[in-house]
Amino acid sequence: SLDGTSSYAIFKDRKERIWVTSMSGVNLYNREKDNFTRIKYLDALTIDIDQDTKGNLWFSTQGKGLFKYHPEKQIWKNYIHDHKNPNSLANNQVNCVLIDTNGEMWVGTMNGLCKYNAEEDAFETLPLEIPSHNICSIIEDQRILWLTTTKGLVRYTPGEGCRVFTKSDGLQSEQFLPNAALKASDGKIYIG
């Protein structure tokens, strides 16, 4: 059965496997047995999942950073914040992860937006001029990143800059929840 009482993300990978995140970590659906297997290595509240072009799955967690997992090789790697290393994650509370249409990985943490450099296996925390660096969700639309934060919605165009939307622009609220955004098949974006 599915572990934990809450699920945060459901993700179908390129091999049609179904992954579900929960309060206790990550679960993999077994179609033949119609049940779930807990991935034992990851014991953390896990919020989001995405898959890179090499087949690695990336899991964002609350408090334990970001995990990379290669399902075929069964190799795990944990990325955490290290205040002595400027190329580490900005914070261990990772709310969301997005692999964009160019294959670039973006990570939303409680302390900023990070961009992953695969060649150097390092992160760059972007110096965005926004009212809150607590990035809750990231959605891509036509190469523009939409970031939800705890103080508004941000439209970020890489290489160009940001525009912040607040209640004065028509938002019902400026506070958003981690990984509570979706781009539907019709192109509409839903945020919460």
Regions found by a protein language model. Give the residues of each.
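Carboxylate-rich, polar loop motifs that coordinate divalent cations or form catalytic acidic clusters
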Residues: 1-192
